[in-house]
Design a protein with these regions (language model features):
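Extracytoplasmic/periplasmic solute-binding protein
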Residues: 1-44, 79, 88
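Paired acidic/hydrophobic, glycine-rich loop segments that form the ligand-binding mouth/hinge
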Residues: 8, 89-94, 113
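Beta->alpha turn/N-cap motifs
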Residues: 10, 93-101, 132
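Short helix-loop capping/hinge motifs at secondary-structure junctions, enriched
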Residues: 25-30, 61, 139-146
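Glycine-centered hinge/linker elements that transmit conformational signals in sensory
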Residues: 38-69
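Short helix-initiation/N-cap motifs at beta->coil->alpha
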Residues: 68-84
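Extracytoplasmic/periplasmic substrate-recognition and gating elements
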Residues: 103-168, 218
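C-terminal capping/gating helix-and-loop segments adjacent to ligand/active sites or protein-protein/ligand interfaces
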Residues: 168-175, 186-245
Length: 247
């Protein structure tokens, strides 16, 4: 539609989960693990090339013009507000966005929703998921009580309390009772063919001046503004990955 862009993003850092799901969608779970483990020249292969070209096209041809100017820690909510004002259709974000933007103006009929990254194969749709962890220290004095508490976290009562607060436990009833505004962020997992991508880059020995976030994510704004070509972006990411992998 006239005046409506396909895409925007809060800040470049939000592309982490976008890339993780996209790489899984293109190359599969085993390929994703290879990328996260810094396999030699993994970013020069056809899968990574396809992913970077797709994102490059999205950034240079279909992104809301205001995005780069507001893609910083002070103004990023203006890009999220653009989504709510029907100036853009899609935006990578987290389930917290509904609460973060609860007081922002919105167009008539606006409602939050969640979908997967583009599917490369039929019935093979990917989302990146963050899962909070709970564990018992080996030196804990009350391990039995701790185990009882952890078990209780998965009870109907506990999942109901989580749902009331807008969060979901990974149980069969975990999405019941969620506020209507945030429910789509979790009920999407009930859809057939949806796969959850979990994980991130493997911890690696520090290399001075090298960081995957800088190479892969912080370059997004430069690609969007035309200051960095996809080819140079790919070379930059591959170099960082190889150095962190010890190649």
């Amino acid at each position: 539609a006239k005046g409506v862009s396909l895409f925007t993003y809060p800040t470049a850092g939000y592309f982490d989960t976008f890339f993780f799901a996209l790489l899984s969608s293109i190359g599969g779970d085993d390929y994703f693990k290879k990328v996260m483990s810094y396999e030699k020249n993994i970013w020069t292969g056809s899968e990574a090339t396809q992913a970077l070209n797709l994102v490059g096209k999205l950034l240079t041809q279909y992104t809301l013009p205001q995005t780069v100017g507001y893609a910083n820690n002070q103004d990023y909510t203006k890009n999220q507000a653009a989504l709510m004002a029907d100036k853009a259709l899609f935006c990578p974000d987290g389930s917290w966005v509904a609460g973060e933007m609860k007081d922002a103006p919105r167009s008539a009929g606006f409602a939050w929703g969640l979908t997967t990254v583009p599917a490369m194969k039929k019935e093979d749709r990917h989302l990146t998921s963050f899962i909070e962890s709970v564990w018992i220290p080996s030196g804990a004095k009350n391990k039995a009580s701790a185990k009882t508490f952890i078990a209780w976290l998965y009870s109907d009562k506990a999942t109901g309390l989580f749902a009331k607060a807008g969060a979901a436990m990974p149980t069969k009833t975990g999405t019941k009772g969620l506020p209507a505004e945030v429910a789509p962020f979790y009920t999407v997992y009930d859809e057939p063919g949806l796969k959850s991508t979990i994980g991130g880059f493997k911890s690696a020995k520090a290399v001075p001046g090298i960081d995957m976030k800088t190479a892969l994510l912080d370059s997004v704004d430069s690609v969007a503004s035309g200051k960095l070509s996809v080819k140079d972006w790919q070379a930059k990411v591959n170099e960082a990955s190889n150095k962190l992998g010890g190649h």
